Amino acid sequence: MFAPRRLILMSLTIAVLSGCSGTVVSPSQSADAGSAKKASPKKPEIKLPDAAKPSQAQSIPIGGHTPVSRRTALKEFGVELAASRQLSEARVLKLIDEARYNPTVIRIVTPPAAGQPRVPRSWANYRGRFVEPIRINQGRAFMQQYANELDRATKRYGVPQNIIAAIIGVETLYGKSQGNFRVLDALASLGFDYPNPKRPDRAAMFRGQLADLIELDLTGKLDARAIKGSYAGAIGIPQFMPGSIKRFAVSASGSNSIDLSNNMSDAIMSVANFLVEHGWQRGLPVFAPVTLPVSADKLVDGGLKANLDWPQLRAAGAKLAPGAKENAWARAPLGVIDLPEEASGRVELRTATTNFFAITQYNRSYFYAASVADLAQALDTR
C-alpha cells in the first residue's frame, strides 16, 4: 500500500529481490557493531550472546546485541510516541525492547550496487505471475466458498465481488500466504536501520507504521509480539499495513473485534471499505472501453489520479471500442496509463477510471492495479 509506483508488488519482492547486492547488514556484522572497541583495557569485557546461527531464527536485537530501548533514537521514539498518543511509556518501551533486527528484511530492501544493470520492466512477465491458472481456479473456488460474504460487501460498498477476490488473490493467494516475518521486527529494522540513506522518507514512513503497530498492541487490537506478515510489515489476508488497520479495517459483524489474519469476512469487508475510502465509485468500470492511438502515450503523466476527461481523449484520437457505449464512465474523470515492455520498447496503453486509481492506493503501481483488474475479469464467470 505504500510502495512507489514502479516497485514490484511486495508479496513478490521477497522472491525477486532477495538476492539484491549492496550494503547488507549480516548477523555477524551487526554483532561486531554491537561489540565495539572497549573504552579502557582495565575494564572487563562484557560477555555478549553468540550471533544467531543459520538454524535459528534469523533475527538479532536491533543494533547488534543492544536492546532497542538502549539506543537513544529508539528510546526517544518510544517516549515521544507514548506522550503523543497517551500510551503507557513503560509498556511502549518494553514492547520496543523486544524488537529484533532482521537482516533478511534489510537485504530485501537494500538497493542494487552502483553500476549494476537494472532489470527491464515487463508487463507481460508481471501479469503472468498473477493472471494464471492457479490463481484463477482458486479464485473461482474462493468466490463460491465466500459468496455470501462477498455479496454483503458488494451491496454495502459497491465494490464488485471479483475485484475484492482479485485483490486477496494477488496479495496472499486467498489467504494462504500471509508472510512469515514478525512484523514488530520488520518495522523496527526498516524504521531505524533503513539501508538507503538517500531515502529518509522511507525510514520515517516505517517508523510511523511501527508507532501504529505499537498503538494497536497496547489498545488490545492485536498482539505485536506474535503477529506475522510480509517483510515490509503488511498483515493478514488483505496485507494491510498497521496504519491501514487503524483507519480502514472493519468488522463484518459490527463488533469491536477485527481479525484480518483469520476472519475472512473481516478481510473481505475491509478490502471493500479501503477501496471506497480511496475513491472507488459504485458502477464505474476499472478501465473505460476505449481504443487509444499510439500518440496517446504523451497523455501518460505517471500519476495516481485521473486528470483527463472523455472530450479531451476524443480530441487526442481516442475512439469507443467496438460495441461499447458511452455511459457513466464517459462523464467521469479518466487517465491514460502505460504498461511497458522495456526490453522491446513496446507499451500497452489503457484508459483508466477513478476506480483504477483507487486500486493504486493499495499498491502504487500501474502493473499491480492492472493485474488486479485482469485477474478480476478472469474470475468473472457471468
What do the predicted segments below correspond to?
Residues 223-224, 228-334:
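Flexible, glycine-rich surface segments
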Residues 118-270:
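Acidic/His-rich structured neighborhood in mature extracellular/periplasmic domains
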Residues 100-103, 171-175, 234, 281, ...:
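Solvent-exposed loop/turn segments at secondary-structure junctions
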Residues 90-115, 168-172, 181-189, 289-297:
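Acidic helix-start/capping segments at beta-turn-to-alpha-helix junctions
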Residues 23-145, 151-154:
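An acidic, Gly/Ser/Thr/Pro-rich helix-cap/linker signature
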Residues 16-19:
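C-terminal motif of bacterial Sec signal peptides marking the signal peptidase cleavage site
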Residues 1-9:
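Bacterial N-terminal signal peptides that target proteins for export
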Residues 293-382:
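C-terminal soluble interaction/assembly domains
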